[in-house]
């Protein structure tokens, strides 16, 4: 397979967005009880604990940037940035460069969550989603 530079290998880590979940399901509960209530609702809806994609708050975005100059590892986390700041930094990569994206389950989880959360924060992600997709899992 021929890859074009630059290449971005990336992954996100998420937690349940309790505030959005409480709003969506009209839960008037103490914050400490919201996650348990959301899990119960999700089990009733789908038989699984895994929350709907829009209810995943991004707490970390990490990437490996590969280009003609070398390799660079980066990470944006909730320790130093708000979710909106992490997304702004990550999405700005696509305004300047058009990297080849590599991820694990990116088209089914990471990219949809990034899109949902960008919309939630009023951010544009159009450059990211003009990438196309190569699915080697077939």
Label each PLM-derived region with a short phrase:
Residues 1-93:
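Conserved RNase H-like, two-metal-ion catalytic cores of nucleic-acid enzymes
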Residues 2-6, 56-80, 92, 97-138:
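Metal-dependent phosphoesterase core characteristic of DEDDh/y 3'-5' exonuclease domains
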């Amino acid at each position: 397979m021929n890859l074009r530079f630059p290449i971005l290998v990336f992954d996100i880590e998420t937690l349940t967005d309790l505030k959005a979940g409480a709003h969506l399901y009209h839960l008037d509960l103490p914050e400490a009880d919201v996650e348990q209530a959301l899990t119960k609702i999700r089990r009733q809806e789908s038989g699984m604990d895994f929350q709907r994609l829009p209810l995943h708050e991004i707490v970390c975005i990490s990437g490996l940037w590969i280009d003609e100059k070398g390799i660079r590892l980066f990470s944006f986390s909730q320790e130093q940035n708000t979710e909106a700041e992490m997304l702004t930094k990550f999405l700005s990569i696509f305004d300047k460069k058009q990297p080849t994206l590599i991820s694990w389950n990116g088209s089914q989880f990471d990219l949809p969550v990034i899109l949902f959360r960008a919309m939630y924060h009023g951010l544009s992600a159009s450059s990211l989603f003009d990438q196309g997709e190569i699915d080697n899992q077939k």
